Amino acid sequence: MSKRLYVAYGSNLNIQQMTSRCPGARLYGTGVIENFELQFKGQSHGAYATIAPKDGASVPVAVWEISKRNEQALDRYEGYPSHYFKQDVPVQLDGKEVTAMVYVMNLKMDFGLPAPYYYDVVREGYEDCGLDPAALEQALRESTAQFYGSHWPHQESIFRFESDAEPDEDELEEDDDPDLDEDEPELDETDPFYFSEGMHL
């Protein structure tokens, strides 16, 4: 069975997740892709990781050796070709350069905020692979700034969960109003901007 090298930069850095999705996949090594930056894009409050060209930047990655069946599974998870496209990129890996396939999000997508659970899965993947989390933290800050037009304090509030915190009266009144959700549109899975919950790079 033919094998292919695949670049993970998001939640598929997480070894438990990747081995569950792609049985038999082997961690080939870790390294960087140069002249790209990590970003969070897609849904406004459920964004996923992607990469974009940027001179002088670099993204820490893991390279997996996958089978054709594994690649087909990843295609489904990543919404290929409508949500992500594939391209080959050079990877600097343990003092040598290899070429590997990477998924890149549809360039029409806007910046957004990752869900806390998804961000934690990615962060755990960085730990699994022994990668420096600085690029991940920078991607979160910059994507937040792009989304809000401001800076880090907004994101800190989103990721702070205090069980004893009391909502203010305005929030309680909004939550108690059954009419607020009447005009909320239903998700259409045929829409090219719809993201399935399986998408985790």
Set out the residue ranges of the language-model regions:
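Glycine-aromatic micro-motifs
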Residues: 1-201
